Amino acid sequence: MVVNLTISDFTWDGFTASWSPSGGEFDSFVIEVTNLENFAESQNLTLSGDAFSLGISGLNPNTSYMVGLYGLYQGSFVEPVYSEATTGGK
């Protein structure tokens, strides 16, 4: 299970996502960033199972995004966690 998805360090084109896994070691994590204005997937990134944060940039300013975090555990994705984040202005 992945818990405590936190968004911090906001900039005009991005932010940092960090999380705390519990219940065992994960094979990998997938972060999906979706623009909430047009529901287009902005980024889909795969990280190693020992990564617990990611700086995300290259997004649109003053835009709301949904950040989804999926953990791959023993070959299966566990229930994802989500957090909403809004980039700042230039």
Residue ranges and their predicted role:
Residues 1-60, 64-90:
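Extracellular low-complexity, O-glycosylation-prone stalks/linkers
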